[in-house]
Each structure stands twice: as structure tokens, then as C-alpha cells.
Amino acid sequence: MKRIRLINLILIMFCCCNMLAQNITVTGQVVDVTSEPIIGASVVVKGTTNGTITDFDGNFTLSVQKGETLHISYIGYVAQDVKVMGNQPVKVVMAEDTETLDEVVVVGTSMKKSDLTGAVASVSSKVLEEKPVTNVNQALQGRVAGVFISQPTRPTDDASIKIRGINTINGSTDPIYVIDGMVMDNSFSGFNAVNLNDVASIEVLKDASATALYGSRGSNGVVVITTKKGKKGEGKVSYDGWIGFQTYANTPKTMNTRQLFELRKEAYTNGYMQTNPDGDVNAYVNDVIMGSNTAFADYEFDAYDNNKNYDWLDAVSRTGVQHNHVVSLSNGNDKGSYYISFGYTDNKGVIEKSEQEKYTGRINADQQIKSWLKVGTNTTFTRTENTLVDDGVMNRARCANPMLEISDEIETLNWQGIFDQNNFNPLRSLKVDNDLVYNRLLSSNYININPIEGLNLRSTFSIDYAQKQQNKYTPNDIYESERYGTQGEAKDDRDTRTVWQWDNSLSYEVSFGKHKLNAMVGTSATRTTYNYINATATGFGTNLFGYHSLGSGYKKDQRGLSTAWSEQTLLSYIARVNYNYAGKYLLTATARYDGSSKFAKGNQWGIFPSVSAAWNITEEKFMKNQTIFDQLKLRAGFGIVGNQNIDDFAYLSLYNVSYTGTSDTGYTNSFVSNGRRGTPDISWEKQKQWNLGVDMAFLQNRVRLSVDAFLIKNKDLLMSHSLPTTTGFSSTIENIGAIENKGLEFALNANLVRAKDFEWNFAATLSMDKNKVTRLYGDNDVVYNVDSDRNIQKEGNLFLGESRNTIYIWKTGGIAQEIDMDRLNKINWNGYNVNPGDLYPLDYDNNGQIDQNDRVVIGSTDPKFYGGFSTDFSWKGLSLNAVFSYSYGAKKLSPWYETLIGSTGSGVASTDLLDRWTPENTDAEFPRVLAGFDYNHYGASSMDFSVQKASFLRLSALTLAYTFPTKVINALKLANLRVYATGSNLFCLTNYNGYDLETGDWYPPTRMYTFGLNLAF
């Protein structure tokens, strides 16, 4: 027995020694095909949890046993297995995984770019992060062909986006957004709720083939957002933060006190001489203008004599400060991953009190429960707190009299000493509290079952809960309360919207020989409920409680209460087939059958099919020996897309419940029409879309060019039109009219220089689209947009054969000169006067009189082409990136500039009027000025004289960044460290004379200087 024990002991010791002998430390380096180190690659002993990740030089060290196999993986590269034969260093060269790198996420499914047959543009998170903005739309500007983005008009607003121009008349042109499979629109500040740092990639779906799976909701295009996930390897903690300082980018130049004083004096003098041609002008100037308060108040004389200038806009302005901070944590393994982020943004605008604070939180997690079962969630919550300032604050400040001393004691801003009860003092208006809060919860939760190879069953339940609350309080001690007789007013508006979406799909993928087939069927159900309540109270004895105590308003007869509710549903059945033969011939066929509650029974359902094909010519044998193209792919597609973008219950005539009576006589309910007549037979608006495209790559894929041409014909437009008063209704919605839209798109990406330490990349987009109205209701060839006095407006009119966005106005005949008067006196000006120095409209139809028939379409607000370009230089750790956007050929009205050039000195005036007509300056650009007398003449705003050219080239962002070298980062025990400085909206080359041709005249455009930090460990 002892002998046996001894033998066993010897064997155990031998085995232990042998095991110890096999336990070795292996070192190695992981690089790419250019010998650049791959940072953060996962190195794991196959079949175990023993592993590590590579450092900043691509190196790793791991204790293993001889004969074990290392599994090396990194996202975007082909994984490799390396068997350990000894303790000699291991060098692993990883090749790019083109299958993964070329994938885009479309409709919750990953597809290789080379397999796409539709028009899809992809933008990575790296590109999005090149501009320090908090809105994804702003980050996309100039990056995607066919996508036109306008900057937000206020810091609390979203940037607007259009994909492939105008495809409808009355309806919205906004696309839908799909965030991790959840379909949403931009209401309730939706897109502004997305944290840009959480975005992994964005795909923009532009044609019917690409948007087909979204049916009617994708008629204006689809923006698909995929958020970040955790990655395999060691956990990662990162921080991204920046702070920016904002100033006015552009303020149109206005006259100072002396210039404005002389302008008004000249206007009064011209008015006097026009009505008193034989009068004593010197006596009038000395005795009336300068010797009385006919033209000037005493405080205006004082400002003129002492050369005082008061800048009211500056008094309500400040240097804006915006800062953004995001912390994220992520990790993953073979069984699951998670990504968690927290964000905070504070944007103090350039107008006093204007501010937006935003809080975001996100958790993305997935877990492989079984080899055939995976579950996951993508959930985010956003709270946005806006402190709003009434538009009138800036407008009244910029319109204020520069001869009026700045004070918060005066109630209204006056010109010539004349009391203006509606021109409230903007400094006092800043006392109004106006708070707007959005809360939004987005949660997409899925279960994925793979019972057999190739078969995939996925069920996703998503919820989008949005809450909006706006509270406003107007104090009882400012003139607004006195003017409107409220003695203080409090308002409480609350909106809630709940959307749930349930998607189920069954897909099967099979390959046999050179054939690859992917088929999918599915259903989608969506229900949206909306609730609104408003309460108003007036009469407050104290301002202490603001809008927090509506019940204390003592004016009981001025209390208000209103509510609204609506519900809509959409049920869809979906089928899609993708076919691929040898990577050469690709075919995609899709059909979606949508049923909407917005239409009456019998018209609720619509079927929307699409088909597209592609030919990878470079995969053909006859192309193997050519050296020009690395890729040459032709694409063609056709599809029908629906649109249901109308109000709920438009097929019914709706009535509001009201009441009549008094507390003495009693109250009775009555039903009052809302003015719109229902149309029971309205149905889907339908678009037919055609797309042709070609994708090319040259010089070892370093230059890529995509070109697309499209045609969209939209008929049975859901249009609202007016009705005769004899019908008892004011309007109705019908399937009437048609519009056509066509265009070209170009997208270029080039790696111009690629050396060891230096790289230069360039990207550009160019888009052209043109729409025209091809049919209106009835036999009409024009539908005018008229105001309450039946005056035809300059914009909003519809003409057959013209764009939806025309400008309809008189053409300018010029400034009348003495030599023209014989000819001009023969024209009937319909109550207006034309004399030397006056502007006059052109008699377009040459009938000797000026009327509405002389107005013409002089252009549209649509650009002839638009796009953007960027250039990126990098040398070692230093990089310089510039992003430009441009637009050409659009025309635009600027109400602000029209006000400035229409001034007679009794209002703020443009310095352009320094070059005005006088008998000594007959070649002036601007007409003479007249005031103080009854003289009816044409103003600049009534003619195309005031229409602006809206072409521009804007430097959207210029960024200088430095990424610290590996030695420094390792010494600090970090994974990444980058600092940068960015200038946004540094310049804009344009002939536009308003504030900004993108943001408009309502809020001044800003320029921002930003300093940022990115670090990870």
C-alpha cells in the first residue's frame, strides 16, 4: 500500500511539474496591413475566459499554456486564430473585414453596401463628431447628397431637414426618424432628444426601394439612426466635453443718430415740397422741422445735438455660453454587451434669459441567453428645459429708436415722442416667465430567436412617450398687462403623446452555389394617443407665485380651460425578398400593405410595392483585367409610396361643444362646426418614384463617386382648399392636385494622400432637385394665397408648371427720372403716385395700367443646387478639418431688410439708404424718401426690388485637434486623449442683406468658438 501511495505521489508531482513547465508567457503585437498598431484588439485563449487587450502600440502580454490557441478579434477586421508553440513573440497582421465595414443598417437588418440596390447614404459617428453641435440634423449639414438642412431659428429649436426636395403641396416635408427600430417624427422636439455622442451611424434612405419597408411613413425619406453598443474586450469609460462662446455672426448695418436724423429731415422736406412745390423749403426746415416738435421730439434733438447713440439690441444681449458633457461606460463579451451614457447640455443664448438645458440617459444592452435566443433593449430618456424669450423682445430692441435713452423705467419705445401702445419696452418684457419642458422616453425591446441556421424570428416592442409642458406668466406690473387688461396672466399648457409600436418579422437566408436568397415577412402595428389641456387665469394681486398658482387669479370671467384628445392607428403587413447571384446581379422586391385609421372604411388600406436591381459590373469576367474601376455598380429602382399626413378624422365633419347662457338663466350646450367639411372618400396620397444610380471606385478604392437621378410623381394630393360660405364650411380636404419632382445627386469621397504620418481626405456633395405643380383642383391653373382682406400674398400661391415655393410680385421698372415722366404719366397707377425719385412697377402686360395682372413669378425659394464639402488634414497626432455648406440660385424675402430700406427716418433704417435718390444723386441705388404728408407711392417691398438673392457659401466648422501620442497616454494610464478647438459659422459669403438666409430674421445667427476634450480609459 505504501508503495502504491509513493508511486501516486511521484506521478502527481510529475504532472504538476509538467503543467508548470507548459505555463508560459507569450507576448505579441497586433497590426493592420499597413503595419499600424491596432489598439484595443481582443486577445483571448480560445474556449476560456483568459484574455487581454492590446495597448496603444498594439502589444499584448498573456500567460497561456503551450499548445493553446489565441483568438484575436477587433471590430472591422477578420478575426484570427494563432496556436502558441512557444514563448517567442507573436505578430498578427489583421485584414479589414469588408463584410462588416461595408454594412449599413436598414430596417433593422444589416446589409453590405455592395448588396444595396436603393439610394442609401451612410454617415459614421466619426464624421458626425467633427462639428461640436448637439443636434444630429446640424451635424448632417452638407454631408449627404440630396439632403437640405437649414439651421434652427432659435437655440431651443431643431434644425429642419428635407430629403430630395418638395414632394407634396399641403403636407409636411419632414422625413421620419428610426432610432434603433423605433419610428418617430420630429414633433415634441423629437430629434433634438437624440444625444449625438450616442450615435454609431446614420443611414439616409432616399428612394422608394430603400424606404419601402416603412410604407406611408417614409414618403419624405427616412433617417435611420443606430446607437452605440458595447464591444468585446476590456471595459471602456469615456468622457466627451466642450464649451463654446457665442456672439452675433451678422447684424445688418443700421443708421446712427446723426444719419437717421438727417434721413427723417430729408423725408419731411421731400414730403413738403411734393405737396407744396412753390413753398419756401428753408423756412419749412428752420421753422417747422428744426423749430418745433413736428418731426422730432425734444429727446431726439438732444441726442442729435450731443451725438448720442443708444443700442437697445445690445441692452438685451449677452455673450452666449454653451457647454456639453457626456460620460459613457461600455463592455461586452461573447454572451452580451452593454452601453450606458449620461449627458448634460446647457445653452445660454445671446439674448438675455434665453436658455436650454438638456439631460440625457441611455442604456443599450443585449444578452445571448441561449445559442438560439437573444434579447436586448435600447432605452433612452431625455429631459429638455427651455427658458423662452418672446420674439418681440429682440424685434422691438432692434427696431428701437437709437435717439431714445435706454431705461427699464419707460413702458413703451417711442418715436418722435408719439406714444405707441404696442411697442413694449423689451427690457421690461424680459420679466415675463416662459418655461417649456419636454420629457421623452424611447424604449425599443426585442427578442431574437434562431431555431435553425438561416431562420430568424424577431419581435420588437417599442414605446415613445412624450410630455410637453409650457408655463407662462406675465407680471401685473409691466405694460403688457395694462394694455390687454389682464393685471397679470398665467398659462399652463400640457400635452402628452404615447406611441407604442409592435414589430414582428420572420426571415430566412439561404445560400446554394452562387445564389443567395433572403426573404422576410412581417407585421407592424402602431397606436398613437394624444391628450392636451390648457388653463388660463388673469388678475393677480402679487407676482410672488408666478404661474404656480392659477387658482389665485381673481378675474373669474377671464379664466379659460380647453382640452383635446385624439387617437390613430396604423397596421401593416410587409414582405421583402433579396436575391444575389455571385455578387453580380442583385434584386430586391418589397411590398407593404398599410391600413390607417385616418381614412373611412373602404379607403383605409393601400398597397405600396417597390422593386430595385443592381449590376456589379466589376464582378464580371470581362472586367477582371481592367485597371480603371475598383467598383462599378449600376442601380435602378421603382416604387409606390403612400402619404397619410393629414389631421385625424378629416373624412368627418367635426363639431365643437360650446355653451350659452348665464348663471341666472342657466347654461345649455350647443354644437359649433370647426369650419372643415368632412370628405368621406378621401384616401391615400400616392407617389411613384424612379431612381437610377451608379457607384464607382478608383485608385484602389481611394476615390469613390456615387451618382443618382430620380423622378417622383405624386398624385391624388391630400390638399386643403377653401369653400364658398354658402356651404356652411370654410374648407375641406380632398384628393386633388399633383406635383412632380426630379433631380440629380453626386457624392464624392477621396483619400487624396495617404502616407505614414500624413493623410488628406476630401468629401463633397452636390444636389439638384426641381419641383413643379402639375395639377390643381377643378380647372384652376392658379390658387392664390390671400389674407383676410383678400390681398394676394407674395408667397404661398400655387401655379401650374411652377415650383410650390414661388415668389409672386411686381417686377421693378426702376427709379423714375425726369426724362421718364412723359412715358410714365400715361400709365394708370391705380391711386398711386410716381414722380422723379420714386420706384415704380413694370407694366408687364403693356395695357397702360398697373394691377394684379402685372404681378409675375420672379423665382422661388428653392435653390438650383446645394451641398457641402469637407477637407481633413492629419499629420501624426495633429489634424485640421474644415466643413463647408453651400446653396445657389434661391431667392428669399427678408421682412427685416424690407423694413430697413422702407424707413423714412421714423423707424430704424439701413445704411444702404445713404445712397438714396436726390436731385443731386440721380444715379442712386435706392429711391427718395418722403414722410409727413399724404402721398401714396409704391414701396420697395411691393416689388422684386427687395427680393434677396439667397446663394451662399458658409464655413460651418473649422477644427484644429491634437491626439496625444501613445507614450503620454500610457504614462497617464488612459486609453485616449484628444483636445480640440473649433470655430463654427466663421464666415458666410452671400449677397443676402437680412440677418441670415437659413435662420431667417427672427433670431440673430451666432458664431461660436469651442474648446473640447475627449478622453477614455
Per-region residue spans from a language model:
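Extracellular/periplasmic, surface-exposed regions of secreted and cell-surface proteins
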Residues: 128-133, 166, 173-174, 323, ...
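Short, polar/charged loop or turn motifs at beta-strand boundaries
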Residues: 29-33, 119-142, 150-152, 160-168, ...
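Short acidic/polar hinge/loop motifs at secondary-structure boundaries
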Residues: 60-63, 138, 175, 180-208
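Conserved small-residue
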Residues: 238-303, 534-536, 734, 751-860, ...
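Short, acidic, small-residue-rich periplasmic hinge/interaction motif at the N-terminus
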Residues: 29-47, 69-78, 85-129, 137, ...
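Residues embedded in well-ordered regular secondary structure
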Residues: 122, 131-133, 143-146, 150-160, ...
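Extracytoplasmic gating/loop element in the C-terminal half of outer-membrane beta-barrel translocons
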Residues: 596, 834, 887-979
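Short, acidic Ser/Thr/Gly-rich low-complexity loop/linker segments typical of extracellular
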Residues: 49-59
